[in-house]
Amino acid sequence: MKNIILLLIAVTGLIFQGCSSANEEAKKVKIGICSDVHLPTMHDSEKRITAFIDSMKIAKPDFIIELGDFGIPKKEYLKYFDIWNSFPAPKYHVIGNHEMDGGTSMEKALTFREMKKSYYSFEMKGFRFIVLDGNDKQNSDEKGYRSYMGKKQLTWLRNELNSTNNPVVVFSHQGIGHDPGIPGERYSIANSKEVRKIFEEHNRKNKKARIICCFNGHTHHDYAEDINGIWYVTINSMSYYWLGEEYEHIRYSADVDKEFKWIKYTAPYRDPLFAVVEISTDGVIKIIGKSSEYVGPSPWELGYPEQLKKYVAPRISSRLLEFNKININ
């Protein structure tokens, strides 16, 4: 695997060297990204996180980020956070809906990650990165998992966008794009149209500080779509695709199945999935993904609805996405 990673790094370098020849002043940033590790679900989470961190130490991104549903704050998971924190460069978390499982409060989830707020921003390599939280309450009596960005957060978002002269990249757990689902289900946040309108209005008024792309997890899909000049990219889970109890299938030993009771309702990926993303203001988003295979039968062999077959797969696709070049001079 190490040789494959080194080859991909070399190829990426050649691509971006070609891009920069047209504009030596182009801004570039390199990101290591993963999503939906789901520590409580998988029996081999330590191996998966270690593989990601080891790969990132070779790839040397400017920072790493996980897009939520990492794990709840329990002592038995501290060792996984220690592995994450062993990466010798900046590292960031996004709060997913499962971070509050088991009655965990948002405050406790944040404290466990040494985070001050569930939404925040940072600057790196001439870009502004905005991390959003899709777990706001849509109404005061709302129960269960949430998928909404409230008024206070969106006011903060507008202020963040108005305060920068740098191109913008957005991260969230729940999606802001269309992210297709089974008919009757909605996978993006409830007010995704409202948030996209904020993005698009900002881009109409700003040429240098345009929003380039938004990355999310949550659905365990492999998906990318350009909506009105902004790329919305769903990063697949590091670990599995969730099927549900009606597709129960025991894929590991009896001991594993007994201790990790949710695995039988998933289609696990044999290898951990993650990606390296490189963004250049020359107008290129380069995603170097990974492919694996299912442990046991695929969702389709178990009768899972086939309308999602295009997006449900044991992979994060490698992609070359283009956007209008940003003139930073």
Question: Whereabouts are the PLM-identified features?
Answer:
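Hydrophobic beta-strand anchors of alpha/beta hydrolase catalytic cores
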Residues: I31, I64, F129, V168-V169
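Active-site glycine-centered loops adjacent to acidic/histidine catalytic or metal-binding residues
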Residues: D36, G68-D69, G96-N97, H173, ...
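N-terminal active-site segment of His-dependent metallophosphoesterases
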Residues: C19-K79
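A short C-terminal boundary segment appended to hydrolase-like catalytic domains
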Residues: K258-N329
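Short, well-ordered beta-to-alpha junction loops that form the rim of enzyme active sites
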Residues: G134, F171-I176, G217-T219, K290-S292
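Extended active-site neighborhood of metal-dependent phosphoesterases/phosphodiesterases
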Residues: K75-S163, N191-I211, H221, E225-N236, ...
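Bacterial Sec-dependent N-terminal signal peptides
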Residues: M1-A26, N203
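Short acidic, glycine-rich surface-loop motifs adjacent to enzyme active sites
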Residues: N159-G181
